[in-house]
């Protein structure tokens, strides 16, 4: 599959880097939609309650002035449907419009990584029990 790679080491793009998940860019230094796998040992080292591989996806924050915050559900921008241009989820959406969950802050009009698959915290407006179905909603 094109535009996908595993971090697998502390060297990213020829430079020492452990902070790539939180990096914010002014330009598309990777093609939007690029996927990156963070190995299970790196995921667990960053948060001991997390396990398994985590897949990140490179996106553009298409919000006019609102930054993504850790745990925000990010959906495809439905005003122009530009591939991998994200907005904060403000309604119940079809799963194919959901891009992922913000793993950290990503300023409006900037590029960065969000979590597409794997264990992470998700902002919600109520309790969640094991086996509960999680959906995006207008509040939360």
At which residue positions do the language-model features occur?
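Extracellular receptor-binding modules and their adjoining Ser/Thr/Gly/Asp/Asn-rich linkers
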Residues: 2-140
